[in-house]
Amino acid sequence: MSFDIAKYPTLALVDSTQELRLLPKESLPKLCDELRRYLLDSVSRSSGHFASGLGTVELTVALHYVYNTPFDQLIWDVGHQAYPHKILTGRRDKIGTIRQKGGLHPFPWRGESEYDVLSVGHSSTSISAGIGIAVAAEKEGKNRRTVCVIGDGAITAGMAFEAMNHAGDIRPDMLVVLNDNEMSISENVGALNNHLAQLLSGKLYSSLREGGKKVFSGVPPIKELLKRTEEHIKGMVVPGTLFEELGFNYIGPVDGHDVLGLITTLKNMRDLKGPQFLHIMTKKGRGYEPAEKDPITFHAVPKFDPSSGCLPKSSGGLPSYSKIFGDWLCETAAKDNKLMAITPAMREGSGMVEFSRKFPDRYFDVAIAEQHAVTFAAGLAIGGYKPIVAIYSTFLQRAYDQVLHDVAIQKLPVLFAIDRAGIVGADGQTHQGAFDLSYLRCIPEMVIMTPSDENECRQMLYTGYHYNDGPSAVRYPRGNAVGVELTPLEKLPIGKGIVKRRGEKLAILNFGTLMPEAAKVAESLNATLVDMRFVKPLDEALILEMAASHEALVTVEENAIMGGAGSGVNEVLMAHRKPVPVLNIGLLDFFIPQGTQEEMRAELGLDATGMEAKIKAWLA
């Protein structure tokens, strides 16, 4: 989309943060209004993360106005809220390409702009990185400032508190801004509290506090009295005791939509020494009423008509794999009151909304705490219950030691329902489910299943749920099922594949939902097609049978080739000294960028055309 200067006259003056800082303060509320309208206009045309960015407009303007970015270093946690940041930092005219193949990255990305200090996508990393950046800046000695912006969801993760605990110990000069976007402004936010925040962050208060500490430091009773007096004054109106105990100077909460007030407070805090903590209250979806009323639905949006206030309804076609899982979960829970379901803040994405309503006493959203989710499941299993951890492939990486140490070594019957396995599309490198087969396959006695359609997905979930000799995992992709008939649930024989088609010379061993594409290739090349079903344990007898009766084998998976299912097939053949040639088709050895799933599969040669071309070139 072309930028309409007449529609956004103030925003048109800002092609960089240097130009932003030349604007008079009085024009900034108008700039915020235009920035918010431009965000609505652009995202509604292109799709993308939406409600979070609407809530951080004033904060973004204030931070870039007060701090000398990019010299001063601004870090955004996760990055859903960073669209206004991208618009103000030279990427305004490209914002319509965000999350598209070859377009702007969905999150702050170091390779895209010097303003993006840290590449992000997973939550709760900003403070840890910020401490390192602040320590490096201190050693550099150029008075470079460091600011981290973290949301109220991301700050619940243990990593954020580990970082704050460390910051309180080594006391780097840095600012952490907590963007608290609950549904309404806290009743503490008002004229008195904003005035107090500016007073407590001001130089007079700071110098009096530090001077008083020095004067009375040798008189323990007076020193303790001063400390307690300060805490009591702040404690009457601020909820920052926890952050103060961690060693931060806490200011807030303040109105995160008062851009001029934010600028005053940030200017006061900019030169304070040691770790500083600013708590701001914002409203997710601010300025667009439908998003304010339903920020979860408007968190990430497809293209939509902003005048209608409604997102396009689903065409009502095939169900998603997430829904297939959610329906199976409810069906199983109705028959077995031992079932317990756990998610790390992914209720909607994992298809668990209905379950959470029907079985609230057996539904546990542990927030952004993947490590805790897995070990909590271990505890439930020890207690005689049947835990299911519903988690995205990319987020299970964060709990790898817990899978190993707390579940697998103890052979606990925990079922991992791994959503978003394989290529996920528009969220790019940080969210592709490229590695789960590789990092799970090496865990002793782990059962790993790869369904080829929604019916197999249900059967495998059922099989894993009733497997009591250790952990099991079922991995399935983002997107819709293929439309096969659902049959009554029954346990599958562990470690057994099935031959779907008999051909000649070439056998294709398929792992997972690339099966429809593999079937087209098998038909075209008159190849045998095998649905392997299990990555662990592998059906060694079937692999050896295929090796004995065919001239070559091809493995197909939507996982990294390195260490994946195909690697397992190679290991079986080598262990049995079978000299049959094998072509492994899967995800290559690089981080896969954003694009639609169809675009990226075509580019990587994972559609039928690409697979057939790879096989023919290999056989030539």
Curated annotation (Swiss-Prot):
Organism: Escherichia coli O127:H6 (strain E2348/69 / EPEC)
Residues annotated to bind thiamine diphosphate: H80, G121, H122, S123, G153, A154, N181, Y288, E370
Cellular component GO terms held in the UniProt record: cytosol
Binding positions for Mg(2+) per the UniProt entry: D152, N181
Family (UniProt): Belongs to the transketolase family. DXPS subfamily.
Pathway: Metabolic intermediate biosynthesis; 1-deoxy-D-xylulose 5-phosphate biosynthesis; 1-deoxy-D-xylulose 5-phosphate from D-glyceraldehyde 3-phosphate and pyruvate: step 1/1
Catalytic activity reported: D-glyceraldehyde 3-phosphate + pyruvate + H(+) = 1-deoxy-D-xylulose 5-phosphate + CO2
Cofactors: Mg(2+); thiamine diphosphate
EC numbers, comma separated: 2.2.1.7
InterPro entries: Dxylulose-5-P_synthase, THDP-binding, Transketo_C/PFOR_II, Transketolase-like_Pyr-bd, Transketolase_BS, Transketolase_C, Transketolase_CS
A GO molecular-function annotation: thiamine pyrophosphate binding
GO biological process entries: 1-deoxy-D-xylulose 5-phosphate biosynthetic process; isopentenyl diphosphate biosynthetic process, methylerythritol 4-phosphate pathway; terpenoid biosynthetic process; thiamine biosynthetic process
Subunit organization: Homodimer.
Main function: Catalyzes the acyloin condensation reaction between C atoms 2 and 3 of pyruvate and glyceraldehyde 3-phosphate to yield 1-deoxy-D-xylulose-5-phosphate (DXP).
Keyword flag Transferase: yes
Gene3D superfamilies given in the database record: 3.40.50.920, 3.40.50.970
Cofactor notes: Binds 1 Mg(2+) ion per subunit.
UniProt protein name: 1-deoxy-D-xylulose-5-phosphate synthase
